[in-house]
Amino acid sequence: MAGKSSKSEWSAKKPYFTKITDNFVLNGESSRKETRHIVFDLGDSGLEYKAGDALGVVPRCPPEEVEEILRICGFSGEEIVETNLGDCPLRDALTDRYEIHRVSKKWIKGLAERSGGDAPKSEIRIVSRKRSSTVDGSLIVDWSSSGEGDVPEGYVEMGEIGDNSAILLHELISDNDAMEDYIWSRDYVDALGDFASFGFTPQQLLEGMDRLKPRLYSIASSPDFEEGTVHLTVAIVRYSHHERDRTGLCTGFMADRCETNTTEVGVYMSPTRSFVLPEDGTKDIIMVGPGTGIAPFRAFLQQREINGDSGRNWLFFGDWTEEGEYLYRDEMGDWKDRGIISKHDLAWSRQGSEKVYVQHLMEKNGEEIWNWIDGGAYFYVCGDKQYMAKDVHSTLIGICSEFGGMSPEDAKDFVETGLMKTEKRYLRDVCLLYTSPSPRDLSTSRMPSSA
């Protein structure tokens, strides 16, 4: 049984509420990363999936942040507000209906529209100056302004000053780079600290906020492995910025605020139409999945073993270090010992004097990779779209050129037209990964732009 995806009554708008039954850290004790294995019970939902699908998870906003927003604004939280899902108390709207972890441009622009868009300015002018002697009280300086631009001797004209909040707002509206930097690194607690002086009604507070969106995570299990469950491999986003500790909205929700077998979490299936195993189980597959990109390949390997497929399985995996970030080490070792994994190449970027990435190992194995592809193998990539997937893509083209006897142009056409579009043997599950405002704290998951 290969598992299947089917239409379900459960969706992003109507998720199935279930519980997490297992939630543990996969990293070694020395790791600075926090990658968790999370298992959801599907109960009597009727939800079905196949290896390669994704699970949608509906997060809830942190209650402490909700309460801080209410405190700053002076609201009780019981005020009734209008939302796209109907009327509800403001506290409920901030918890379950809006994204409060990152400020939206629309919200900032709404402030500008309400305030008229211009930074109010004030002018301070010295109109007189008197100075008396500390000895006998006699008047030493007696100066009065004679008109605009007149300043006493020894003074420098400073120009105009304005309300700090209004000046900041004017800068954000007029400078797109400043706007991007501001919204990337701040949530609504930060923003209200800057703009609370503008004043809000409960309804105005919500105007321009983004609606709360589910996050998609590549499923890390075959439906036939532990029936009635679905597994995820999730990198927890944690960082400090503007003197506050923060987490990704959904990853922090699952890691910190979901009590095992107790907290209800909304989920639904997001089927893939292309990132699937070959129908012919005798076909070889090559899988490239560093970091949490390993998730769908754990599902693939489980499914191939359960099906008894005879095709060979070649897995490229990588991360920072073997000791800290070798995810599912025991499972991978067991599969390798039993021949389920035919070849297993590991790349560690922070172990030793040289940074080694998966594309470097592909280059070293270029001739064999070409032989597999030339023999009908499928090639899969999962993970970071911006860097890793691009490097793997260009490396694959180089391999096909060098060992397939093609010009660089012909190799590019072979990969991008032949393998990807015509034969559909080159399949990718890639996305822009979330990074915290500090580039040193990069964490990964399959999710839209924010965690």
Label each PLM-derived region with a short phrase.
Residues Y434-A451:
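Single conserved hydrophobic/aromatic residue that forms the stacking wall/gate
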